[in-house]
UniProtKB/Swiss-Prot annotation:
EC number: 1.3.1.88, 1.3.1.-
Source organism per UniProt: Saccharomyces cerevisiae (strain ATCC 204508 / S288c) (Baker's yeast)
Source organism superkingdom: Eukaryota
Protein name stated in the entry: tRNA-dihydrouridine(16/17) synthase [NAD(P)(+)]
CDD domains: DUS_like_FMN (cd02801)
Family stated for the protein in its record: Belongs to the Dus family. Dus1 subfamily.
Keywords from the named record: Acetylation, Flavoprotein, FMN, mRNA processing, NAD, NADP, Oxidoreductase, tRNA processing
Pfam family, one: Dus
Molecular function terms, GO-annotated: flavin adenine dinucleotide binding; mRNA dihydrouridine synthase activity; tRNA dihydrouridine synthase activity; tRNA-dihydrouridine16 synthase activity; tRNA-dihydrouridine17 synthase activity
Biological process, per Gene Ontology: mRNA processing; tRNA modification
InterPro entries listed in its UniProt record: Aldolase_TIM, DUS-like_FMN-bd, tRNA_hU_synthase_CS
List of residues that carry N-acetylthreonine: 2
Cofactor(s) annotated in UniProt: FMN
Amino-acid positions noted as binding FMN in the UniProt annotation, renumbered to this chain: 35-37, 92, 160, 188, 223-225, 247-248
Length: 423
């Protein structure tokens, strides 16, 4: 691959918006759909914006494949991605080669507001491919990746990182990323080892430490521990972040971003039948987006997670659906049956009582749990060491207390049952 032209690099730097300029230009978004592998695709971004999201990231895209494989691009990008209904938009890539990263980013720079480098993915595929959080020890390479985009793209470059156990090392890491040219910094408050059943609690205190000790002009996003809409404002206030990013919280309940609708359960805990129908219609309208239809089955399972154990016939049918199924088959075998069941539930004489959402006592982490009927979207409490539900928070606290003390002696803030999905 050839070196980028110097004149092109100079022009890009002259015209490029800095962090605060870009943040203002895209409307100062505060509620962000996280980059999620095979999950934050076009149709899901459109749905999330309808329910309060003000900025969205694409799924993590593999830079080398995107730059070199036409099929990969067609499977993951369409003419609708980055269109007027899909802005503001940040396109995220994983990479370990500056030239391939730049080549990939050049293909989308006219269809997005910024390009993000994934430095947070903790999954085995990232370890095997040598990208994401498995670059955390290679600061020279990370600096080169970011700086190459900073000097040669029309649009700004941003980055999403995880933290180290050591607060000072995390701070120096963040400073390096910013020095390389990142205009937005997203900090996921978990270390690389926190994934799956070891996800545990995101450390808001470490995120706050970074925010407090980085330049004030840094555009700073926090990621981790978002279960309900009020957690967003609580996170922003505690940390001083410009915005909050949600991954799994958004996947199981798009209403998590509806911060101005906290007394409207139809907005913050929407009925699964209505969300399924609305999302299905969006996917049909985005037929140019192969990624949207490919992701639909996975989204259905997440939206319907509390519902399916009560209606195993629908779960069995959904499990058999595949990419060859027609739109009519999806509607007749999945969408309509869900609608029928929920409609029957709402015809019950005591539905007003059954449909109540109760709020528990305030917890040590600052928020309260909700008891939500299974026919409404709601957070997913991922099991930890076989423990499910709210009890896993206490297990997380116990596990933390018996593990080695964090070098910076920073206490954990807030409790969470979600993990960052692949990004």
């Amino acid at each position: 691959m050839t070196e980028p032209a110097l004149s092109s690099a100079n022009n890009a730097l002259m015209q490029k918006l800095t962090g605060r300029q870009l943040f203002d230009k895209i409307g100062r978004p505060t509620r962000i759909v996280a980059p999620m592998v095979d999950q934050s695709e076009l149709a899901w971004r459109i749905l999330s914006r309808r329910y309060g999201a003000t900025l969205a990231y694409t799924p993590m895209l593999h830079a080398k494949l995107f730059a070199t494989s036409k099929k990969y691009r067609e499977d993951n990008w369409s003419s609708l991605d980055g269109s007027s209904v899909d802005r503001p938009l940040v396109v995220q890539f994983c990479a370990n080669d500056p030239e391939y990263l730049l080549a990939a980013a050049k293909l989308v720079e006219d269809k997005c507001d910024a390009v993000d480098l994934n430095l947070g993915c903790p999954q085995g595929i990232a370890k095997k491919g040598h990208y994401g959080s498995f670059l955390m020890e290679e600061w020279d390479l990370i600096h080169n990746l970011i700086n190459t985009l900073h000097k040669n793209l029309k649009v700004p470059v941003t980055a999403k990182i995880r933290i180290f156990d050591d607060c000072e090392k995390s701070l120096n890491y963040a400073k390096m990323v910013l020095d390389a040219g990142a205009q937005f910094l997203t900090v996921h408050g978990r270390v690389r080892e926190q994934k799956g059943q070891k996800t545990g609690l995101a450390n808001w205190e470490t995120i706050k430490y970074l925010r407090d000790n980085l330049p004030k002009e840094t555009v700073f996003f926090a990621n981790g521990n978002i279960l309900y809409p009020e957690d967003i404002s609580r996170c922003m206030e505690h940390i001083g972040a410009d915005a909050v990013m949600s991954a799994e919280g958004n996947l199981y309940n798009p209403g998590v971003f509806n911060v101005g609708q906290t007394k409207n359960k139809e907005k913050i805990f929407p009925r699964v039948d209505k969300i399924i129908r609305e999302y299905f219609q969006i996917v049909k309208e985005c037929q140019e987006s192969k990624a949207s239809k490919t992701a639909m089955k996975s989204h259905f399972f997440k939206i319907l997670r509390p519902f399916l154990p009560h209606h195993t016939d629908i779960r069995s049918t959904l499990a058999t659906m595949n990419a060859k199924a027609t739109w009519e088959e999806w509607e007749e075998q999945v969408v309509k049956p869900v609608e029928k069941v929920v409609q029957e539930i709402f015809e019950q004489p005591d539905i007003a009582i059954k449909d109540e959402i109760t709020i528990g006592e305030k917890q040590s982490w600052g928020g309260s749990y909700r008891t939500v009927p299974y026919w409404r979207c709601q957070p997913y409490f991922r099991p930890v060491n076989g423990i499910t539900g709210d009890k896993r928070v206490m297990q997380g606290l116990i596990d933390e207390s018996v593990n080695k003390k964090r070098k910076a002696d920073v206490p954990l803030e807030s409790a969470d049952k979600k993990k960052d999905v692949k990004a």
